[in-house]
Amino acid sequence: MLPIFIFDTNILDQLPSATDRRVAFIHSALNQLQQQLTQMGASLQVYHDTPLNAFKKLVQQHTIDKVFTNHDYEPYARERDDTIALFLQQHNISFYTYKDQVIFEKQEVVKDDGKPYTVFTPYSRKWKATMDPSYLKSFPTEKYFNNFHQQSARPVPSLNAIGFKETDTTFPPATPDKAVIKQYDKQRNFPAIEGTSHLGVHLRFGTISIRQLAKQATTMNETFLNELIWRDFFQMILWHFPHVGKGKAFKPEYDFIQWRNNEDEFARWCAGNTGYPIVDAGMRELNATGFMHNRVRMITASFLAKHLLIDWRWGESYFAEKLLDFDLASNNGNWSRLSRELQVAVAMQRLISGSSIRICKQKSSIRSLHT
C-alpha cells in the first residue's frame, strides 16, 4: 500500500494569498504523518499537480491494482473523482471510495418517502433515531501497518516549493478537551469564554475522527452532539442540492431581495471598521488568526446581510478566504440561512403593510457611525 497526497493545483492556484493558513496547516499535518510513516519503514508520496496529472505519473512509476480514497461531497470534488475513476478504469485499475468524514451521508438519513430533509430539526430527530454504537466503532488500523510499501522516506515539498509561505499561526491541538465538551451547552454562547472546542480545522482536514468526537459527545453533552449533526446535515444538503455550492440560493425565490451592496461598507466590514465593537472584534480576530467564535460569526453575518443589506454571498466568499476551518458545506449552509430568514421577514413585512416593500430603501448604513 502506497500512501499519497496531492496538493491540487486546481485549488491552490485560485487562492488569493501565498500566506494561506489552511495550506500551512495541511503542510504541518503531512510532515507529522511522514514522521509516523518513516518509523514503519514507509513514506508518503506527495505531488503538487492536478489530480489527473498526478495519477498519470503514478501509473508510470508503479504497478497499481487498486486505488482507495474517501468520499468528498463538494461539487468540484465529485467532478474530480469522476475524472480519476474514468482514467483508472481505462488503465484497468479499480477505484474504491468510502464514507469517512461524516457519521451519516447521502441517503442514510432521509424522510420516510426517501426524499432528503431540508429542515434541521426533523433531520436531527431521524439522525438520533438511526444512530447506534456500530456507527461509532473505531477501526483497528494498526493491524494493517505492515501492508505499507517499504521505501526510504521522501521529504514533503516545502511550502515555498509549492508557492506558499510560512505563517505565524499557532494551530489548535487535535486532542478534544473533555472539560470544554462537558460545559459546552453552558459556555458556547459567550465569546469571552474559551468555551468552544477549536476542533473545526481538524474535522475539516481529517486530523481527528468524527466518530471519536461523536462517541464522546453522546455521553458528555447533547448540545455538542447537535453541532456535529449540523455538520452532517449541511454535507447532506450539499450532496442533494449541489447548486448551493455554486453561488446559488437554496431556492430561487430567496434571490428576490434587492441588496444595497455598498462596496465601501463591505470593505469596512471586512476590515473590522464598522463602529460596532462586537462586529469589529470578530472581523479583526478572523483577519489576524483565521478563527472567529461561532456566536460572533452569526452576529457579523447577520450585520452584513440584515443591517447593511449586502448580498450574503459576499460574506460567504470572505469567510471562505479567511477561515482556518473553512468547510464549503457548513459555511454555505450557515450563510444561506440568512437569505431564507430575510425572505421570510420581508414577506411578513409585506403582509403587515398591505403593500410591496422595497427593502433596499431601508436606512442601513455605517457611514455615520463612530469609528
What kind of region is each of these model predictions?
Residues 87, 202, 213-217, 227, ...:
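Generic, well-ordered alpha-helical scaffold segments in large soluble proteins
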Residues 93, 115-255, 356-371:
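Glycine/tryptophan-enriched, flexible segments
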Residues 257-258, 318-371:
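C-terminal, helix-dominated tail/subdomain
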Residues 78-79, 97, 132, 309-321, ...:
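Short conserved catalytic/interaction loops centered on acidic-Pro-aromatic/His motifs
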Residues 233, 238, 242, 284-287, ...:
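Hydrophobic alpha-helix feature that most strongly marks membrane-spanning transmembrane helices
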Residues 243-278:
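Helix-loop-helix junctions that connect adjacent transmembrane helices in secondary transporters/permeases
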Residues 1-131, 220, 284, 330:
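Trp/Phe/Arg-rich N-terminal binding region typifying the photolyase-homology
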Residues 235, 264-310:
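C-terminal substrate/ligand-recognition segments
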